[in-house]
Amino acid sequence: MLEQMGIAAKQASYKLAQLSSREKNRVLEKIADELEAQSESILNANAQDVADARANGLSEAMLDRLALTPARLKDIADDVRQVCNLADPVGQVIDGGVLDSGLRLERRRVPLGVIGVIYEARPNVTVDVASLCLKTGNAVILRGGKETCRTNAATVAVIQDALKSCGLPAGAVQAIDNPDRALVSEMLRMDKYIDMLIPRGGAGLHKLCREQSTIPVITGGIGVCHIYVDESAEIAEALKVIVNAKTQRPSTCNTVETLLVNKNIADSFLPALSKQMAESGVTLHADAAALAQLQAGPAKVVAVKAEEYDDEFLSLDLNVKIVSDLDDAIAHIREHGTQHSDAILTRDMRNAQRFVNEVDSSAVYVNASTRFTDGGQFGLGAEVAVSTQKLHARGPMGLEALTTYKWIGIGDYTIRA
């Protein structure tokens, strides 16, 4: 089965690579329209997936990721339309010039070819990834989690209808709908057909892909994100940022998981934090230095376990640790961070600059929420993933991350001397 999918995707990629920006946008507009026109079939499929997942004991955080509503589906369709409005990087001349030999040389952006994406209970990923791949002239093979099998099948059927109505092969966007985990291992060895693999899921999935894949892998998306509250931070303003970073949508990878508090501001900051977190329904996991003071406040507090500093809670839970200074905060982030998103709240711009220079994450913020690490917020449109590695792509992966380049030499029967 996967062999045939690979062949179909590779053939489709050749046709997609030749499309003009106008032709690609016409396909995306059709997909957005069909997602809305056929929303009932997608929502019905999703309702069945959610019911099964709840019966199987899936966590509330994962159920939130899995669930679609009419409003969420409309947002997904609107995101596709936003991709239409983005500049098409394919064909862009990155640099070039005329050599001494007279050869005119260009470095030009081109599609990667076929993208493979493995993800878990995130039905929006199906459309986000498909739209970005189509915009950049790439075919895509999708493998969603078993929890989303009905939703993904219904969504891909709608996308393929739109493709065919525009005269393009259905092989441009395909989904592996068999939940057999053995197919993941088989997919990881499809380097004959797939040019780049992107896993979106937990640490176990990323480890599996790194160890078994014969395809280049872009990993990331695991977000043990930190906010450091410097001694000069404005408490009321800092709390607004922390509430946003923790509670806006706790099941996302750019949500803050650990709060590092400078010891010199702790006495005034912790009571205010407890009050705010109680109002927000957040459970605090406090270290020994913060525990007694936080227990005196209204928020729910437990003693932090050492391993929780490495946890991506994806829930209304927040570690709180007292640190001696900026050096201590940076050391903690280096030990426990996942190079996703980290922030400093401060009025001291020298400390801010040190934090930016010394914290080696894909996104680093000064006096801003970690929740900004998102393709849409960065002006990239829907993102295919957030990469926390350094090669090929880093941070939210928009259109350019789905391209490579080729060198083009144009001469007049020019020969090398």
UniProtKB/Swiss-Prot annotation:
PROSITE patterns: PROA. It catalyses: L-glutamate 5-semialdehyde + phosphate + NADP(+) = L-glutamyl 5-phosphate + NADPH + H(+). The keyword Oxidoreductase applies. It is found in: Cytoplasm. One of its GO terms (cellular component) is cytoplasm. Its main location: cytoplasm. It is an enzyme of class 1 (oxidoreductase). Its EC number is 1.2.1.41. It holds the Pfam family Aldedh. Keywords: Amino-acid biosynthesis, Cytoplasm, NADP, Oxidoreductase, Proline biosynthesis. One of its GO terms (biological process) is L-proline biosynthetic process. One of its GO terms (molecular function) is NADP binding. Pathway: Amino-acid biosynthesis; L-proline biosynthesis; L-glutamate 5-semialdehyde from L-glutamate: step 2/2. SUPFAM superfamilies: ALDH-like. Belongs to the gamma-glutamyl phosphate reductase family. Catalyzes the NADPH-dependent reduction of L-glutamate 5-phosphate into L-glutamate 5-semialdehyde and phosphate. The product spontaneously undergoes cyclization to form 1-pyrroline-5-carboxylate. HAMAP family: ProA. This is Gamma-glutamyl phosphate reductase. It comes from Escherichia coli O81 (strain ED1a). The lineage of its organism: Bacteria, Pseudomonadati, Pseudomonadota, Gammaproteobacteria, Enterobacterales. The gene is proA.
